[in-house]
Amino acid sequence: MKAATTKSEKRERRKKPIIFCDFDGTITQLDVTDQILNQYAHPAWREVEQEWSCGSIGSQECLERQMALVDASAEELNALIDAVPVDPGFPRFLRWLEDSGLPFYVVSDGFDYVIRRVLKRAGVNGQLRNGDALFANTLSVEGRRSVASFPNRSSECKHGCATCKPVIMRRLSREHGPVVYVGDGLSDRHAVAEADFVLAKHQLLTYCREQGVACTPFDTFDDVVDAIEGFLNSSRAGSGGAKSRGPRARRGTRVSTE
């Protein structure tokens, strides 16, 4: 039987930051889903992508329609996935996470099939690869057909997302301190509203700048480690709670990292 959480443990947990991270184009250097579509899908996938980019459809409908256009065997997909490079700073980031003891979750509009294979190659095990620290869509390969399903969609979602990142983040961050989000693409644009500290690159960086969302640019996970440490150190140096610098600051959220 699991022991009850004490008040002191709850207080400590509220002070501890929680980190959420995208996968495709963030942990990997390329968007794996886009690579699959480029290589093996009927060209009509680009028209579907445009519908999603302009907001006409959500990512669930987008991915469902796009993956139905893929013609590839499991062996072909695996070979493509195995060739996708991982961010060179990611191993250091994982070591830093282990040393710091901070909770870390991958929230992705990509596919568990892909993510688990890449993480295995990167030497990642445990909850991040096999357990409840990974939230993504499901992909089944049947002959040359790829069938997508969406276990992390939500009835609360207003945007038709395949993986509703804001709902997941709100649920998991209730008893934690500052919320950190790391991402690169348009599928992250709704997630940043739930973060106190945003690290962004590529399309997400452009979106944040256009929308006036406070963020810190990054290139690799070496930058991510340094930026998060800087954010936490500056928070600790303040008196009492530290004002959040990300989107949640505009809602008056107050956080503490002491």
Regions found by a protein language model. Give the residues of each.
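C-terminal cap/substrate-recognition subdomain and adjoining C-terminal extension
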Residues: K2, G89-P103, G110-E258
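Alpha-helical substrate-recognition element adjacent to the catalytic core
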Residues: K2-G123, G131-T138
